[in-house]
Swiss-Prot record:
Name under which the protein is recorded: Large ribosomal subunit protein bL36c
Membrane-crossing residue ranges in chain numbering: none
UniProt keyword Nucleotidyltransferase present: no
A Gene Ontology biological process term: translation
Organism: Bigelowiella natans
Length: 37
């Protein structure tokens, strides 16, 4: 899980979603997991 100020999609499988007020990226590739913070 990377914590970044600006999250963006890295590949076409990445999905940007909001979870309890936080913007996160989920993907089939675990290296692409990101959270805004």
């Amino acid at each position: 899980m990377k914590v970044k100020s600006s999250v963006r999609k890295i590949c076409e499988n990445c999905k940007v979603i909001r979870r309890s007020g936080k913007v996160i990226v989920i993907c089939s590739n675990p290296k692409h997991k990101q959270r805004q913070g």
